[in-house]
Regions:
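Outer-membrane beta-barrel initiation region
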Residues: 1-169, 229-232
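Gly/Ser/Thr-rich loops at beta-strand to alpha-helix junctions
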Residues: 16-17, 188-191
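Composition- and surface-driven signal marking solvent-exposed, interaction-prone regions
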Residues: 22-25, 185, 196-198, 254
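Transmembrane beta-strand segments that form the barrel wall of outer-membrane beta-barrel proteins
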Residues: 106-118, 143-150, 176-188, 209-217, ...
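Feature captures outer-membrane beta-barrel proteins of Gram-negative bacteria and organelles
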Residues: 127-137, 162-175, 194-214, 236-246, ...
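Outer-membrane beta-barrel proteins
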Residues: 144, 154-156, 192-194, 219-223
Length: 254
């Protein structure tokens, strides 16, 4: 979208496993284009805006004139969680190209469990491979279907059986003023199934995050007698959380 002095673009990284690599490729492509003035790049995740990268016209012109390199552009560009102005500029933009909807990823998660809780054994262990199919649905919607394949363990019962992992449907939403929401239903980890709602707020610089979660879950397990057993008794859980990120030390405090 073109506004006086600024070109606004939204993009989603569907190619590179590293988000930073995808962002870098998008910035490089925009700087090599023939647009004039400043640039605004909205980073999307499953079509939900997450970040806005601002490159003023002085920065883009200095790069195109060979006065600074791409590394210096990264150091001087602005990054904010506030995407409201940029998304307003994109409201009447053309149809998106290569959307993420209905694209499927096959991901394999290695899983190692170690626990020392007995005197007659040094530890109990379990090594699993957890392949998962992850599909982006509509805007903010995602489906995950995972199976747990035991590789080696000295445990018994369910831990030796092929069993379902995370089988869930989630919906992300973004409200104005940096407020995010997520609703997830399905089969979770730690033998729990049910539903969970998350709400969080992030400051513009992304350092502070405040939020809360609430859910209702029941017991879920694979047993020899009942197959996939799903308990009816529900347990209500809720929590409040806060985190702070210190970029100079690359540390996050929860």
């Amino acid at each position: 979208a073109q506004t006086p002095g600024v070109t606004t673009v939204s993009f989603e990284n569907n190619v590179y496993r590293s988000t930073y690599t995808g962002v870098g490729k998008a910035i490089d492509a925009c700087l090599e284009s023939k647009t004039k003035g400043g640039l605004q790049l909205v980073v999307l995740e499953n079509r939900i805006p997450r970040l806005c990268i601002n490159l003023p016209d002085t920065l883009t012109e200095a790069y195109r004139n060979g006065e600074i390199n791409l590394t210096q552009v990264y150091q001087q560009m602005g990054i904010t969680v506030d995407t409201d102005p940029a998304m307003k500029a994109l409201k009447n933009a053309g149809q998106e190209e290569v959307p993420s909807a209905w694209k499927v990823d096959l991901v394999i998660y290695p899983d190692l469990f170690l626990e020392n809780n007995t005197f007659d054994e040094l530890y109990t262990y379990a090594i699993n491979l957890n392949p998962a199919v992850e599909m982006a649905l509509w805007k903010g919607g995602k489906m995950t279907a995972q199976v747990i394949l035991p590789v080696a363990t000295n445990l018994s019962g369910e831990m030796k059986r092929i069993r379902p992992g995370i089988i869930a449907l989630s919906q992300d939403v973004r409200f104005r003023h940096n407020i995010f929401g997520k609703m997830t239903v399905g089969n979770f980890t730690n033998n729990r199934y049910g539903a969970q709602l998350e709400i969080k707020y992030r400051t513009n610089n992304g350092r502070w995050e405040l939020g809360g979660t609430a859910g209702s879950t029941g017991f879920s397990a694979i047993t020899r007698e009942d197959g996939w057993y799903i308990g009816r008794k529900q347990r209500i859980n809720a929590s409040l959380n806060a985190s702070y990120y210190e970029p100079r030390l690359n540390l996050q405090f929860d």
